[in-house]
Structure formats: C-alpha cells, structure tokens
A protein has these predicted regions:
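A residue-level marker of the well-folded mature domains of exported/periplasmic proteins
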Residues: 1-244
C-alpha cells in the first residue's frame, strides 16, 4: 500500500499439481488481500523443486512484466530475495530466514521448527511399545502440525524493511489462528485498524471464498476448507491469483 503498487510476485516450484504448493499460494494471497484488498498475486511457476537459475529468472520476469513491489516464493534458495534486493523492492522468503542474504529486501519467511517433530517422534518411539504401533501413535503416516504446536512459524521480522505495526498485526492474527477462532480458508476475511498508539483491531467480515475463475468454494461465513483438501487435493487458485 505504501508503495502505491497492487502487484505482488510469487515464484512457485509448482502450483495446482501439488496441494502443498497450491495451498501455499492461496494462503499467501488471502493474507495479502487482508492488508490490500486490491492486490493481485502474479505466480511464475518454474516446474521444479529446486533450480537457482530458474528461481532468479522467474523473479526477474515478474518484476519486468508486472512491476511487482514484493517477491514471495515457494522454493528453497534465496535467489528470488536477492533479485528483489537487486531491484530495490521487498520480499518474503521460504523455508529459512533469508534476511542475512538479502537484508535490504527480505521481510520475513515461513519456517518450520523441525525440533518439534523430532522430539515428538523420539518420545513416541520410546513410549509406543511395539515399533509397529509407531505410525498409528504419531497420528498417521503423514505428520501435520501448525502454529499452535510451534512447528510452523515465521522468521524474525526484519525491522529494517517491515512497515510500522507489522509485528502487532501478525501477532493478532497468529492469536486468532492458534485459538481456532479463525482460519485463512474460511468464509471470513480479515482487515485491520491500527490506533495511534499501535493497538491493532482485527475486523472479521463474512465473505465467500472464491476461485480465480469465479467458483464459490466456501459460502460467506462458512467453515474452513477441510484439512484433507488443503493438504491433499486442493487444485485451484483463489480470486486474486494470476498465473503467468
């Protein structure tokens, strides 16, 4: 908003081919729209899990084509963040804190505290008895945890690049997610009011969750998309996503 630019770039390893990447793109877009309802997220897919040259080229193409003011990503290297820094714009990383590599552009990144999983797995292995019981005791073959378990997190906010009151807004939304009061894939959208003293008020508005082709996924005020869809079968992009 401060940049007067509604264009956001996103370098994606994949998109609707995998629920992991698709849900990440969608969740990021919905978060962006809570701050700037007029924002469009332009996705450039590189069709590989890792290729630093392609990641950098995809970021540069988003900048050149759409004049994006932020580069986000679902790929592991810091090349998109370095490209953002080279072009004087901002960025959000993935998998690790990329502020050290791009201190003048990087804001924060989605990260995972793997020690949470390792501790859970080791303690379960020690107490489940027969090793054949391990998978069942862990809750299934796939392990899922989130903010409430401190497995999913965001890296330390780079105060040199973050807008004022960003931390307060993030903390307020985190509290809603952890408490179960709100979910990003529900039929409820968020917006924020910030008082002069920095106090954040989160506003919740019933609104349908729509795809970018106009299909309604969740009715206004409706419950979140099922976890199994988010983690296993989500194959659409939400309204506001443009795939380049």
């Amino acid at each position: 908003l401060e940049l007067g630019n509604n264009a956001i770039g996103y370098v994606a390893a994949w998109n609707t081919e995998y629920a992991e990447t698709c849900s990440g793109i969608n969740a990021f877009t919905l978060g962006v729209q809570s701050v700037n309802p007029d924002a469009t997220v332009y996705v450039n897919q590189i069709s590989t899990w890792g290729d630093e040259a392609k990641e950098k080229a995809a970021a540069q193409a988003l900048i050149d084509t759409y004049n994006v003011c932020v580069i986000a990503q679902h790929c592991d290297s810091a090349q998109p963040q370095l490209c953002a820094q080279d072009n004087g714009i901002f960025g959000c990383g993935y998998n690790s804190d990329m502020t050290e590599q791009a201190p003048n552009s990087h804001i924060t990144a989605a990260i995972w505290h793997w020690n949470v999983y390792y501790q859970t797995a080791i303690e379960t292995a020690m107490t489940c008895g027969d090793p054949a019981n391990f998978v069942t005791a862990m809750g299934g073959a796939a392990y899922y945890a989130g903010l409430a378990e401190n497995f999913v997190d965001t890296s330390a906010l780079n105060e040199a690049t973050a807008a004022p009151n960003t931390a307060a807004v993030m903390d307020a939304v985190r509290a809603l997610i952890v408490s179960g009061e709100w979910d990003v894939f529900s039929g409820v959208k968020l917006s924020y009011d910030i008082a002069e003293d920095g106090t954040v008020t989160v506003n919740k508005t019933d609104a349908p969750l729509m795809t970018n082709d106009g299909t309604e996924i969740v009715a206004a005020g409706g419950p979140s998309v099922d976890d199994g869809v988010i983690t296993g079968s989500m194959n659409y992009n939400v309204e506001g996503v443009v795939v380049s």
